[in-house]
Amino acid sequence: MDTELLKTFLEVSRTRHFGRAAESLYLTQSAVSFRIRQLENQLGANLFTRHRNNIRLTPAGERLLPYAETLMSTWQLAKKEVAHSLQHTELSIGATASLWEAYLTPWLQQLYKQRETLRLEARIALRQSLVKQLHERQLDLLITTEPPKMDELASLLLGHFSLRLFSSIPFELPEKTDDGTEHKNANEAPYIKLEWGADFHQQESRLLNSEQMPVLTTTSAHLTRQLLDTTGGCAFLPEHWQKEYPELVVNADIPPIVRPLYAVWLQNSDQQTLIRQLLKTPMNNAAQSAIRD
């Protein structure tokens, strides 16, 4: 349905006069009458009764009125949102919560310091959801530890980052019992499972060698850090956080897990130039690979 017809209907119902409605809409009176007839033909019902200068809504017109108001309000909101997106969003970037919190937020801060007019949309979601958005052209750039294997996607290795097993209290060394067996292994501490990718969980299981269920499973690195003291647990967190959060205690017996960091976008994306320009800005605390033009 043509929204201009609904707009004309609402103006006539408000003014109860075709001439005044025409003035408000900057139309001729005949154009207003023609639009109303078009709308009536589409609906198969008369919307106004006309007795000289006395114009009233018919029962059909009364029923249409609230729907017309809602439709026009929704249409105006839709136009506003589309215009806002065109004016204020240059590029949409997606990543998991843990990557945003640990590495990408400082990178974003650097980008805005370098480009005052930069307009971005930062999305936080699970990797599977972001890959789908990228494939459907709803997302411009994906930052992930595992690039999707799709022919239409281009990927670039940005570098690597290191994760260490942290707790908020010192890890206890294994103690020996009278028969010589060890107990109180550090791996027996409550464990918080943080999402760092499917490949990570394989390394995680191999290093911890523990079958205990995690006390918490989450995608948020900051939530994990804040709950270490409460739970008395441990978790794999960014190695550089040891300097930022002195309360974190590293388990020196567990080696670091090194993860790759990739940028992924559509090969035929019209944002490729901007994407490559932004990726030249180093991601602090993640070793950088060379990014060429």
Swiss-Prot record:
Every HTH lysR-type domain range: 1-58
Gene Ontology BP annotations: negative regulation of DNA-templated transcription
Entry keyword annotation includes Chaperone: no
Top-level taxon in the UniProt lineage: Bacteria
Alphabetical list of Pfam families matching this protein: HTH_1, LysR_substrate
Stretches that traverse the bilayer: none
InterPro entries given in the database record: LTTR, LysR_subst-bd, Tscrpt_reg_HTH_HdfR, Tscrpt_reg_HTH_LysR, WH-like_DNA-bd_sf, WH_DNA-bd_sf
Keywords for this protein: DNA-binding, Repressor, Transcription, Transcription regulation
GO molecular function, one term: DNA-binding transcription factor activity
Portion annotated as DNA-binding: 18-37
Gene3D superfamilies tied to this protein: Periplasmic binding protein-like II, Winged helix-like DNA-binding domain superfamily/Winged helix DNA-binding domain
The keyword Methyltransferase is annotated on this UniProt entry: no
UniProt family annotation: Belongs to the LysR transcriptional regulatory family.
NCBIfam families with a match to the protein in the record: PRK03601.1 (NF002946)
Function: Negatively regulates the transcription of the flagellar master operon flhDC by binding to the upstream region of the operon.
Name assigned to this protein: HTH-type transcriptional regulator HdfR
Annotated organism of origin: Yersinia enterocolitica serotype O:8 / biotype 1B (strain NCTC 13174 / 8081)
